[in-house]
Each structure stands twice: as structure tokens, then as C-alpha cells.
């Protein structure tokens, strides 16, 4: 059996101003829910996704109106834009002409070779990568006839078939996804894909469900895949506001130490010793830090006796008691604050530390560029 390709060893592929593959960073993606031809609504949703931490966004391109809107959308957003194309190669050509940063297709359903070749040549000319989207629910008939039902081996065979179509045209800026709604099937498919080729892998559990159920299902499946060193980019697919997809993705990556640009909240599960409204405070603080782009760790704990010691890895935190709270940094108490102002005091400290971290990161960046 071939050795599994770790995410750091995958082939680097440029998507807009980002590099996917060849490093340990995972890029968070989402997809718009608007009609793409409605430029104003689509841009507004993308702006919300950007603010939440989305790094790449995909739009459906089902018709010419959608393809024609790409150029206008691109002018108004700050993250790479991906066109989702099915069947009609002319829509891919229009999207590429409009300045799209990546195209998601299955070469096998675009049509005859000359159509695929036209898309590949246009993408190659503009330096645009292609994502091959393998889905357990839409495998080719001959593969289903061979295996009887969707299997990991069948999904990998489909991916290799599509990869070969592009490679035969001397095209190698390829990203591959192996999506399934069955968690175990998805895990097996991604493992086998990581052994079969070294192209970057886009992770996802498709049709995972509503906000609650889909979050659990995606975390279970993608967490198992991430823990094996597989995956270069991911989308949490939810029947919910796409901003929620980004929030879940950020939390998942933080759990594995794979998010260097996101804040983390540490909070206790509550018990009978608590004298403050810890749940509402934790929710308020979580919302406050949700858009921070620095790896600050913030703790909200209900016990002033054990709290600071239990969260000594936190950059800043509060531990509540009746009438007052302890503000602490790295496990050391800084000062006592009145209960009615302790959340505001915590927010002030968060702002200071976040600014320091951002300045330090900028300084490191300037040093590296010299």
C-alpha cells in the first residue's frame, strides 16, 4: 500500500492570493446561498462570511446570468472566488473570463474532450486551478456497476479517472474533494485518496444536516480525517446560515491546533458552586472574540478558588465569585473587579492583548520579507 501523503507534502496550488497545499495551514471555505446573479445580495453575504473568517467562497453558476455576474462580484470582495460548474463548459469559460479564482467541475460530466480541453486551456492561460469534486451520491454509472454501491475504492477510482483527464492535457493545478454523507465512507475515501495521489484535498461531509446535527456529524468525520494529517482546505456543510459553517470550521481547526488566526474560549461546564451567570457571560465573551484574527486564549470560569489555576494557559480570563471577579493572566491574578463591570474589564484586556499580538505578527511578517 502506498504511503499516505501528509498535508504538508501535498502539491502547492495557488488560489487567488492563497496557497493551498504544501503546508500545515487549512483554508476555510463556504458557499453562498443567494442567487449568484443577484450581485448585491451575493456580495453582502460574502462580506459577512469574510468578517466571520471565511478565506475562500464558492458560488453556484447554473446559468449565464450567474456567470456574467462574476466580474462584478470579484470587484467588491477580498477573498478568492470559486465557480461551481456542472455540465455546461461554456459557463466555466465565462467564469474564467470574469476573473474567477478557481473552478469546481467534474471533467467527466463536462462533455466531449474538446470541451474539457477548452476549459483546461482557459484555466491554464489564467493560472486558475480546477477542483475535481467527487461525491458518493453522484458516481459514474460504470463505477456503481463495478462496485454495486458507493465505496471508497470507487470514489478514488473516479478521482483518478478525472485527474488523468486533466493530466493528459498537461494540467496539474488540481485540488480534489471526496465527499460523502456517510462519515465512515468519507473517512475511508480521504485516507485512500491521500495514498493514491499528492494533490491537495478539500475536506467535507456533504448533506450533513442542520446546525446542531450537522455540526456534530462534520466534527466527527472531519476531526478523524484531520487527526491523520489529511486535508488542506475544508467546508462544514450545514443547512443553516453559511456564517455558521465558518464558525464551526474555525472551532474545529482550533481543537487540533490548526488555526493560528483565531481566538479560543475556555469556559467551565458549571456546577452548584457558581455564584454568577456564567453561561450568559461565556456566550457574550465568545461572541466578542469570534472575529478576532489572533490566537488569543480567553477563559471564563465560575470558581474563584480553582479557576485561575485550571486555566493557566489562558492569556486572559475572569473567575467569578459573589459580588466580584478575579481578572487573571497566565494563571496569575492581576486584580479584583466588581461583578457588574468584570465583563467590560475583560473585554478591555482582550483588546489590549489582541492588539499586541497583531503588532507582533506584523513585525514578524516584515522581518521575514526583508
From Swiss-Prot:
GO terms for molecular function: 4 iron, 4 sulfur cluster binding; 4-hydroxy-3-methylbut-2-en-1-yl diphosphate synthase activity (ferredoxin); 4-hydroxy-3-methylbut-2-enyl-diphosphate synthase activity (flavodoxin); iron ion binding. Gene3D superfamilies: Dihydropteroate synthase-like, Sulfite Reductase Hemoprotein, domain 1. One of its GO terms (biological process) is isopentenyl diphosphate biosynthetic process, methylerythritol 4-phosphate pathway. Its cofactor is [4Fe-4S] cluster. It catalyses: (2E)-4-hydroxy-3-methylbut-2-enyl diphosphate + oxidized [flavodoxin] + H2O + 2 H(+) = 2-C-methyl-D-erythritol 2,4-cyclic diphosphate + reduced [flavodoxin]. It comes from the Bacteria. [4Fe-4S] cluster binds at residues 268, 271, 303, 310. It holds the Pfam family GcpE. It is an enzyme of class 1 (oxidoreductase). Belongs to the IspG family. Converts 2C-methyl-D-erythritol 2,4-cyclodiphosphate (ME-2,4cPP) into 1-hydroxy-2-methyl-2-(E)-butenyl 4-diphosphate. This is 4-hydroxy-3-methylbut-2-en-1-yl diphosphate synthase (flavodoxin). It comes from Bacillus cereus (strain G9842). The gene is ispG.
Amino acid at each position: 500500500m502506498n504511503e499516505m501523503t501528509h498535508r504538508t507534502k501535498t502539491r502547492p496550488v495557488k488560489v487567488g492570493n492563497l496557497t493551498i497545499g504544501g503546508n500545515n495551514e487549512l483554508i476555510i471555505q463556504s458557499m453562498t446561498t443567494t442567487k449568484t446573479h443577484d450581485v448585491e445580495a451575493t456580495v453582502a453575504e460574502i462580506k459577512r462570511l469574510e468578517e466571520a473568517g471565511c478565506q475562500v467562497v464558492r458560488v453556484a453558476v447554473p446559468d449565464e446570468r450567474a456567470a456574467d455576474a462574476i466580474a462584478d462580484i470579484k470587484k467588491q470582495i477580498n477573498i478568492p472566488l470559486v465557480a461551481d460548474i456542472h455540465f455546461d463548459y461554456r459557463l466555466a469559460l465565462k467564469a474564467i473570463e470574469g476573473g474567477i479564482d478557481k473552478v469546481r467541475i467534474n471533467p467527466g460530466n463536462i462533455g466531449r474532450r474538446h470541451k474539457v480541453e477548452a476549459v483546461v486551456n482557459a484555466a491554464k492561460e489564467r493560472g486558475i486551478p480546477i477542483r475535481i469534486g467527487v461525491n458518493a451520491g453522484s458516481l459514474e454509472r460504470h463505477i456503481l456497476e463495478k462496485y454495486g454501491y458507493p465505496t471508497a475504492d470507487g470514489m478514488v477510482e473516479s478521482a483518478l479517472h478525472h485527474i488523468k483527464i486533466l493530466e493528459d492535457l498537461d494540467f496539474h493545478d488540481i485540488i480534489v474533494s471526496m465527499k460523502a454523507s456517510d462519515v465512515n465512507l468519507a473517512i475511508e475515501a480521504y485516507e485512500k485518496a491521500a495514498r493514491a495521489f499528492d494533490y491537495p484535498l478539500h475536506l467535507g461531509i456533504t448533506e450533513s444536516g442542520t446546525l446542531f446535527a450537522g455540526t456534530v456529524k462534520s466534527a466527527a468525520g472531519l476531526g478523524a480525517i484531520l487527526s491523520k494529517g489529511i486535508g488542506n482546505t475544508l467546508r462544514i456543510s450545514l443547512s443553516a446560515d453559511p456564517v455558521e459553517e465558518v464558525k464551526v470550521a474555525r472551532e474545529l481547526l482550533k481543537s487540533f491546533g490548526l488555526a493560528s488566526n483565531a481566538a479560543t474560549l475556555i469556559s467551565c461546564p458549571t456546577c452548584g458552586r457558581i455564584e454568577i451567570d456564567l453561561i450568559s457571560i461565556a456566550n457574550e465573551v465568545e461572541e466578542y472574540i469570534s472575529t478576532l484574527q489572533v490566537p488569543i486564549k480567553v477563559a471564563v470560569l465560575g470558581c474563584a478558588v480553582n479557576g485561575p489555576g485550571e486555566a493557566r494557559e489562558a492569556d486572559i480570563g475572569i473567575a467569578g465569585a459573589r459580588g466580584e471577579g478575579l481578572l487573571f493572566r497566565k494563571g496569575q491574578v492581576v486584580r479584583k473587579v466588581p461583578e457588574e463591570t468584570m465583563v467590560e474589564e475583560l473585554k478591555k484586556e482582550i483588546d489590549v492583548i489582541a492588539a499586541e499580538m497583531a503588532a507582533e505578527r506584523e513585525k514578524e511578517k516584515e522581518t521575514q520579507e526583508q
